[in-house]
């Protein structure tokens, strides 16, 4: 066996950032992500279009487990549900200064 590796150290990503920096960036966003109606086409194999009517994703298990990615209502994976991101109020530091009078007419 080879030497033991320290698994607690931050591992760099391909872009040079570390896992700790990436996690800190996710926490700063404070965005709420919800998964709404299921969009899985159950009739795709026969050339049709039919959805099951599931209105909102409900996790089957605890956060961090494989079951958390399956919907308790329809049994589909979370990726089949429409993703909705509720962003905080946009903080725009930009201003439109049209009073200079140097624009074209």
From Swiss-Prot:
<keyword id="KW-0862">Zinc</keyword>
<dbReference type="GO" id="GO:0000976">
    <property type="term" value="F:transcription cis-regulatory region binding"/>
</dbReference>
<comment type="function">
    <text>Inhibits zinc finger homeodomain (ZHD) transcription factors, by interacting with them to prevent both their nuclear localization and their DNA-binding properties.</text>
</comment>
<protein>
    <recommendedName>
        <fullName>Mini zinc finger protein 1</fullName>
    </recommendedName>
</protein>
<dbReference type="Pfam" id="PF04770">
    <property type="entry name" value="ZF-HD_dimer"/>
</dbReference>
<dbReference type="GO" id="GO:0050793">
    <property type="term" value="P:regulation of developmental process"/>
</dbReference>
<comment type="subunit">
    <text>Homo- and heterodimers.</text>
</comment>
<feature type="zinc finger region" description="ZF-HD dimerization-type; degenerate">
    <location>
        <begin position="35"/>
        <end position="84"/>
    </location>
</feature>
<dbReference type="GO" id="GO:0008270">
    <property type="term" value="F:zinc ion binding"/>
</dbReference>
<keyword id="KW-0863">Zinc-finger</keyword>
<keyword id="KW-0963">Cytoplasm</keyword>
<keyword id="KW-0479">Metal-binding</keyword>
<dbReference type="GO" id="GO:0005634">
    <property type="term" value="C:nucleus"/>
</dbReference>
<dbReference type="GO" id="GO:0003700">
    <property type="term" value="F:DNA-binding transcription factor activity"/>
</dbReference>
<feature type="region of interest" description="Disordered">
    <location>
        <begin position="1"/>
        <end position="29"/>
    </location>
</feature>
<dbReference type="InterPro" id="IPR006456">
    <property type="entry name" value="ZF_HD_homeobox_Cys/His_dimer"/>
</dbReference>
<dbReference type="GO" id="GO:0005737">
    <property type="term" value="C:cytoplasm"/>
</dbReference>
